[in-house]
Each structure stands twice: as C-alpha cells, then as structure tokens.
Curated annotation (Swiss-Prot):
Chief location bin: cytoplasm
Protein name, UniProt field: Tyrosine recombinase XerD
Gene Ontology MF annotations: DNA binding; tyrosine-based site-specific recombinase activity
Active-site residues, Swiss-Prot/TrEMBL: 149, 173, 251, 254, 277, 286 (o-(3'-phospho-dna)-tyrosine intermediate)
Compartment annotation: Cytoplasm
CDD domains assigned to the protein according to its UniProt record, in alphabetical order: INT_XerDC_C
Keyword Nucleotide-binding among UniProt keywords: no
Lineage: Bacteria, Pseudomonadati, Pseudomonadota, Gammaproteobacteria, Lysobacterales
Source organism of the structure: Xanthomonas axonopodis pv. citri (strain 306)
NCBIfam families: PRK00283.1, recomb_XerD
Length: 305
C-alpha cells in the first residue's frame, strides 16, 4: 500500500470518528475495507483518490471471483460511500466514483434463536468453581437477559451497572445510551461475579481504565475480554451444553432474547427500545420468527393442525 493512501485512510478515520462518533470496531472495519482496496490498487497510479468508477467495478468483479460474500461487498460499498463522500465535501475529489453502483441484493435471513431449553443448558455450562467460570456465567446471563450486542457486553464499563436500581446503562451504535433492566437472575450472577470473581481476576489490584472507563468484565491481565475471546467462550460452552457450536454465536443470544420476549407477549415498541434499534423496521423481523413459532405450536397441538 502506498504511503499516500495510508495517510489518507488515517485522516478519514480520524475525521469520521470525530464527526460521527462511530465505534472502534466500525472504524476497524472501515480501515480493512479501504486498505484492501488500496492494496488491490497498488501500482495502478493515483491511489485511492485517483480511482474511477470503472476501476471500482473491476475491483467488485475481482471480489466476486475471489468468493467474497455479498454481505461483505455491501459493507465495503457503504465504507467507500462514506469515504468518497467525505473526499467530495473536502474538495479532494470533484466526483463520487461510487455513484450509480448498486449494492448486491441480500436475501433477508431470519435471525436464528436457541430454544429456551438450549439457553438454560448454555447458561449452566461454565465451571462455577473458578473465577473465570463465574465471570463467564455472569456475561452469558447478562447478554441473554439484556439482549446486548457483543461489543456492548465486552465494552461495558463498571459504572454502567446500577445494582440498586437493577438497570444497565448501555452505549450502543452511534454512541446512543439506553437503560436496560437486569432481571433477578442476571443481577444475582453479576453480584456474585463482582463479589467473588472479579477481585481474584484482578489479583486485588486496581483495574486500569480503557478509553477513559474501567471495564466491568476482565481477564487475569486485568484487561477487558475481546469480542473474539467471548466468541470462543460461547462456542466452547455450546459444546459443553451439547449444542452444535456451529449453530451458536454471541449474536444468537441477542436473537434469542428478542424472540423469547415476543413469544411471551412482549410489545414490539418495547423490544425496539431494549435492543437499541433506531428503526422499528429492524425490530419487525423478529415478528416473523415469533409467527413461525406460533405456527409450529398450532401444527403440533391443535386437533386440526
């Protein structure tokens, strides 16, 4: 990658973080997308700022031949639109090469939820005789009880928990805060983690702030767990619980939270608020899952099903 492209990418990421307040994971996705295009573009001259629409079409065709998924390509186009839109506003370009490029069609896939019995088995999988096991039980309980995104869970600051009132203050997408009730079960395990496990993981030493805030969930190095670490934990506990790990993901716990609430009669608007969705249309996909559940119940138990 050319040094000029590396410099342009850094400036874009700095600007976008300052103006939009996007999450660190989103910035890293933008970086990967732009660096991938820059490396493919190496040697062609002009770098990222000199690319035209024809070259972008060539890159998209190359990605198709390389078996990149349509979802990955759609995200790439979103990154490039943000990047070249900023270049256009700043006068670094006189046009937007992503204009008139349509994103690939994405089939609307229904979120996959675990059954309630599978959730119970998964939550019971950690070894409660170890500090890490207690921490993991609290994390799993909290993710299912509050419907958190994995990034929200691993980045949750200690000050975001109010055990007296039984609520979490969660910072979601777009740096938007929301209050989420804990529930008795998740509050119980969170209290046990804070009382019995966290001091041992921290070796009774102060936990340093990360990005200005002290993390709630830590490992033995007194650092927050990464999304990848938590992903691996969920897969491991799925195997312990007798569930195919390929069918389980951290986001699946969020899907299960939403689906089970709807199955038990939750209001769609309330669910939207709990999930932190900016648009109700994003939440409505769960009604399809709930409807399928009701149809299966009817077919199984109604005399004329």
């Amino acid at each position: 990658m050319q040094p000029a492209d590396a410099s342009v990418i850094e400036r874009f990421l700095d600007r976008f973080w300052a103006e939009q307040g996007v999450a660190r994971q989103t910035l890293e996705s933008y970086r990967r997308d732009l660096e991938g295009l820059a490396r493919w573009r190496d040697g062609a001259g002009g770098g990222l700022l000199g690319i035209d629409r024809a070259a972008l079409f060539d890159y998209l065709r190359w990605r198709t031949r390389a078996n990149y998924s349509p979802r990955s390509t759609a995200r790439l186009l979103s990154t490039l639109r943000a990047f070249y839109g900023l270049c256009l506003r700043d006068g670094a370009r006189s046009d937007d090469p992503t204009a008139l490029i349509d994103p690939p069609h994405l089939p609307r896939s229904l979120p996959k939820a675990l059954t309630e019995s599978q959730i119970e088995a998964l939550l019971a999988a950690p070894d409660l005789d170890t500090p890490a096991g207690l921490r993991d039980r609290a994390m799993l309980e909290l993710m299912y009880a509050a419907g958190l995104r994995v990034s929200e869970l691993v980045n949750l600051p200690a000050v975001g928990v109010n055990l007296r009132q039984g609520v979490l203050r969660v910072t979601g997408k777009g740096s938007k805060d929301r209050l989420v009730p804990l529930g008795e079960e998740s509050q119980h395990w969170l209290e046990r983690y804070l009382r019995e496990a966290r001091p041992l993981l921290a070796a009774n030493k102060p936990v340093a702030a990360v990005d200005g805030q002290v993390p709630l969930f830590i490992d033995v190095s007194r650092q927050p767990l990464s999304r990848q670490q938590f992903w691996a934990l969920v897969k491991r506990y799925a195997a312990v619980a007798g569930i195919d790990p390929a069918t389980v993901s951290p986001h699946g716990l969020r899907h299960s939270f939403a689906t089970h609430l709807l199955n038990h009669g939750a209001d769609l608007r309330a669910l939207q608020m709990l999930l932190g969705h900016s648009s109700l249309s994003t939440t409505q996909i769960y009604t399809l899952v709930a409807r399928q559940h009701l149809q299966k119940l009817h077919a199984s138990h109604h005399p004329r099903g």
